[in-house]
Amino acid sequence: MGIEPNILENKKRHIEICLNKNDVKGGCNFLKFIKLKHNALSDFNFSEINIKEEIFGYNISMPVFISSMTGGSKEGNDFNKSLVRIANYLKIPIGLGSFKLLFKYPEYIRDFTLKRYAHNIPLFANVGAVQIVEFGISKIAEMIKRLEVDAIIVHLNAGQELMKVDGDRNFKGIRESIAKLSDFLSVPLIVKETGFGISPKDVKELFSLGASYVDLAGSGGTNWILVEGMKSNNLNIASCFSDWGIPSVFTLLSIDDSLKANIFASGGYETGMDIAKGIALGARLIGVAAVVLRAFYDSGEDAVFGLFSDYEHILKMSMFLSGSKSLLEFRNNKYFLSSYLLDELGVFKQFYGT
């Protein structure tokens, strides 16, 4: 039995819509209001700079990962397979698209079982928090085991679902399900938003529920309410939420430093300088997604390799010019904030009680 045509068409449309950045970018990521400190007396060899990280039992080449995007359609599966191979060569982690459809179409599991292409890197499976409630802890855990991944991402995407005509409406029980799943798993649990951010209070709660890592996935990147609004030709509603959400910058600047080793940041990180700023703010890893999708569909695998080569050089340059040999040094007060961001941050902290 093949996958229903409407499901395949929806996934294909997601890719098509996300290729046009200007149509689906939501809000401001506030990264432009952060400046990295300049040190004119960096007294060491550029080759001494080390941007490698050890995480999930692997040594990765830089503190960047490819965030989950799509899967299920032929286009999405081919895209994922290519990206996993690229990520393995580059030695960076990668997340796969949601495996929700495998509960209805288990015969397609090989399209999601890509560890055979990812021997050198952490590979993440991905499913919605609502699906844990829907299918139960044991089925989710068994699927994760079959997919042979190094960690599981549980995504929170209420905004997207509420905008979909046939999306989920009942989110009751997701907290309890996340907590129970964390107890049941033999791999780390990553909980992420999908472009609307996570408040400092919710970050603490997710860790208390058993999350190993939290990906802030803030506003300022792809806005999935706009994506669904475009897909259903209903921008009258979707456009009202064009600037909805919390930029990851605000949460990074508001949480305790002790939590940051387990914090990933994504949502509008597109350039090497964006990545450098996110790392300087303390994020363990920075996630990139749509910018990779666009590079791949514009110019193929070579463009993706070029993108990550630029990321590596810009991050190393930023570290050298701020007098940092290591990521640890780079995360040690190597930035300053504009007066505008300081004012906005003050309002944010007051509003969210941090």
UniProtKB/Swiss-Prot annotation:
| Keyword Magnesium found | yes
Primary location group: cytoplasm
Q: Which GO terms describe its biological process?
A: isoprenoid biosynthetic process
GO cellular component entries: cytoplasm
Disulfide pairs? Answer: none
The entry marks the following residues as binding Mg(2+), namely 161
- Per the UniProt entry, the Enzyme Commission number(s) are 5.3.3.2
Q: Does the keyword DNA-binding apply?
A: no
Q: Where does FMN bind?
A: 67-70, 98, 126, 192, 222, 289-290
> Which CDD domains does the record cross-reference, listed alphabetically?
IDI-2_FMN
Report the InterPro entries cross-referenced here: Aldolase_TIM (IPR013785), FMN-dep_DH (IPR000262), IPdP_isomerase (IPR011179)
Q: Where in the cell is it found?
A: Cytoplasm
Catalysed reaction equations from the record = isopentenyl diphosphate = dimethylallyl diphosphate
Q: Which UniProt keywords apply?
A: Cytoplasm, Flavoprotein, FMN, Isomerase, Isoprene biosynthesis, Magnesium, Metal-binding, NADP
CC cofactor: FMN; NADPH; Mg(2+)
Which Gene Ontology terms cover its molecular function?
A: FMN binding; isopentenyl-diphosphate delta-isomerase activity; magnesium ion binding; NADPH binding; oxidoreductase activity
Positions that bind substrate: 11-12, 98-100, 160
Q: Which Pfam families match?
A: FMN_dh
Question: What family is this protein classified in?
Answer: Belongs to the IPP isomerase type 2 family.
Function field:
Involved in the biosynthesis of isoprenoids. Catalyzes the 1,3-allylic rearrangement of the homoallylic substrate isopentenyl (IPP) to its allylic isomer, dimethylallyl diphosphate (DMAPP).
PANTHER family, alphabetized: ISOPENTENYL-DIPHOSPHATE DELTA-ISOMERASE
Q: How does it assemble?
A: Homooctamer. Dimer of tetramers.
Q: What is this protein called?
A: Isopentenyl-diphosphate delta-isomerase
Species name? Borreliella burgdorferi (strain ATCC 35210 / DSM 4680 / CIP 102532 / B31) (Borrelia burgdorferi)
